[in-house]
């Protein structure tokens, strides 16, 4: 397939009827299909959208282009869950079928209001001369998952002084009404977050620009997301073009967070924003969406993928996945991330690490498993994740002497994104015990360090299913356990074809 403007934006109904079933069948045959991470049945998945709890279950949407591993004509795919682990595919929910989203239904969020779910999202439109127009749109979903779009945009254009790069509304409700944080770019190409207010979800007025520190803006801010943890505001966002002088990062675009003491939305003012911090220290996290659950917990899910990067699965006409759902907590102003408790229910058979001659091996694993490892102060060990033939490996080095964790994907057998480096490293306190929780799901890893103080996430592509784990090095007093995971009960991952309704 030659991907150009015409093929990327061909209306779905103009594709041959046989095309989508062929792509779904091709993706199902991939050795890199995951068991527990949400992934597209075909084509490209990107940003998580509309994460919410409504009508007794969790709802999550994601952007998808079903016809290829490229950023084309985007829709929202819909999945639901009772436990945040097992997801059911509800099919395509929002399609690009109006004059205001004709070239893609882009990122947005959702709020349960009475017996409906209100959705606010960005509609992408291209003019005849391919100029961008961005509309902030609204829709209502009922308890039968039927969606009715509003006939007119909620916000028809960016205010004066801002470009048409104006997208990704984050809905917030408080005692005064409704707010929306919208990613933006000034006409001088500086990233911004605009704050809008509405009393009725229909008429919206701009309250001004959120006082994000000047060195944290880049040239465009995408995917702003606000949650409260212990009554403190936490802003997650993606400042494209962020200066390396502000904070060093290796990925093409970073996903960052800011904690502040207080936030006055009416005045668009943070009080005492803390230091800008990278949300994930791995290779592939972007566009994280976070919400406050009905019980107050802050929950987040990330796109494990990056714009403008080619992945090995592109050759199979599918790309990317979402992270496991993570719970966010604060301690001493630092954001901790850990998988939600229901992830523990995936565990089945346990294997204690038994070391012989400074090495322990667990074999015959089924591709999805986790390692809990404790490395005492001044010890260094290396964890290797390999296929049965050990033709390639993902390597995790835990150095409790220098206080470092490094992940190396140079030798997996299928390299990609090499321009951005094949190793990532987290710096911790030297001469202290380090604990890691390493989750492997066929072609994705999530590594939680010191109870979620740091997280490293990424894709890796072995030549066959990961089935061997070994730990070696100075293993004196090192302890660990490997848990196999049960097979997926997801119908939202691989057991359902994309429904185009």
Curated annotation (Swiss-Prot):
PANTHER family: BETA-FRUCTOSIDASE (PTHR43101:SF1)
Listed Pfam families: Glyco_hydro_32C, Glyco_hydro_32N
Protein name per Swiss-Prot or TrEMBL: Sucrose-6-phosphate hydrolase
Pathway: Glycan biosynthesis; sucrose metabolism
Zinc among keywords: no
Catalyzed reactions: Hydrolysis of terminal non-reducing beta-D-fructofuranoside residues in beta-D-fructofuranosides
Highest taxon of the lineage: Bacteria
Sorted UniProt keywords: Carbohydrate metabolism, Glycosidase, Hydrolase
Active site: 47
GO cellular component assignments: cytoplasm
Positions contributing to substrate binding: 44-47, 63, 106-107, 167-168, 222
Enzyme class: hydrolase
GO biological process, one term: sucrose metabolic process
Gene3D superfamilies from the UniProt entry: Exo-inulinase, domain 1, Glycosyl hydrolase domain, family 43
Organism name: Pediococcus pentosaceus
EC number: 3.2.1.26
Sequence similarity: Belongs to the glycosyl hydrolase 32 family.
Record has Hydrolase as a keyword: yes
InterPro entries: ConA-like_dom_sf, GH32_Enzymes, Glyco_hydro_32, Glyco_hydro_32_AS, Glyco_hydro_32_C, Glyco_hydro_32_N, Glyco_hydro_beta-prop_sf, Suc6P_hydrolase
Molecular function in Gene Ontology: beta-fructofuranosidase activity
């Amino acid at each position: 397939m030659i991907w150009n403007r015409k093929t990327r934006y061909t209306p779905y109904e103009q594709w041959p009827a046989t095309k989508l079933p062929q792509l779904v069948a091709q993706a199902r045959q991939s050795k890199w299909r995951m068991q527990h991470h949400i992934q597209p049945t075909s084509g490209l998945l990107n940003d998580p959208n509309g994460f919410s709890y409504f009508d007794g279950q969790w709802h999550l949407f994601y952007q998808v282009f079903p016809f290829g591993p490229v950023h084309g004509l985007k829709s929202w795919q819909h999945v639901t869950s009772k436990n945040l682990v097992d997801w059911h595919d509800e099919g395509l929910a929002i399609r690009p079928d109006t004059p205001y989203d004709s070239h893609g239904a882009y990122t947005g969020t959702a709020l349960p209001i009475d017996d409906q779910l209100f959705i606010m999202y960005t509609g992408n439109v291209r003019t005849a001369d391919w100029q961008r127009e961005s509309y902030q749109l609204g829709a209502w979903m009922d308890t039968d998952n039927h969606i009715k779009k509003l006939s007119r945009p909620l916000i028809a254009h960016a205010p004066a002084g801002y470009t048409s790069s104006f997208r990704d509304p984050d809905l917030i409700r408080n005692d005064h009404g409704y707010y929306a944080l919208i990613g933006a770019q000034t006409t001088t190409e500086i990233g911004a977050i605009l704050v809008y207010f509405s009393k009725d979800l229909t008429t919206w007025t701009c309250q001004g620009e959120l006082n994000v520190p000047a060195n944290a803006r880049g040239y465009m801010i995408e995917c702003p997301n606000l949650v409260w943890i212990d009554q403190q505001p936490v802003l997650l966002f993606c400042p494209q073009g962020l200066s390396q002088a502000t904070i060093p990062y290796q990925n093409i675009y970073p996903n960052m967070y800011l904690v502040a003491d207080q936030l006055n939305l009416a005045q668009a003012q943070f009080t005492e924003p803390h230091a800008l911090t990278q949300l994930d220290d791995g290779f592939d996290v972007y566009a994280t969406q976070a919400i406050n659950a009905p019980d107050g917990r802050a929950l987040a899910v990330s796109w494990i993928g990056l714009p403008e990067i080619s992945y090995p699965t592109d050759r199979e006409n599918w790309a990317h996945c979402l992270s496991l759902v993570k719970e966010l907590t604060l301690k001493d102003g630092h954001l901790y991330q850990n998988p939600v408790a229901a992830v523990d229910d995936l565990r089945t058979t346990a294997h204690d690490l038994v070391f012989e001659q400074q090495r322990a091996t667990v074999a015959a694993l089924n591709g999805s498993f986790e390692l809990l490892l404790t490395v005492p102060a001044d010890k260094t060990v290396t964890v290797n994740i390999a296929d049965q033939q050990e033709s390639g490996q993902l390597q995790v080095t835990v150095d409790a002497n220098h206080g470092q964790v490094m992940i190396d994907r140079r030798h997996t057998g299928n390299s990609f994104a090499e321009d951005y480096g094949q190793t990532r490293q987290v710096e911790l306190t030297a001469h202290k015990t380090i604990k890691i929780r390493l989750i492997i799901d066929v072609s994705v890893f999530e590594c939680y360090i010191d109870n979620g103080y740091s997280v490293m996430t990424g894709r890796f592509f072995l030549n066959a299913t990961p089935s061997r784990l070994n730990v070696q090095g100075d293993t004196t007093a090192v302890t660990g356990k490997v848990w196999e995971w049960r097979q997926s009960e997801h119908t939202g991952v691989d057991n359902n074809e994309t429904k185009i309704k």
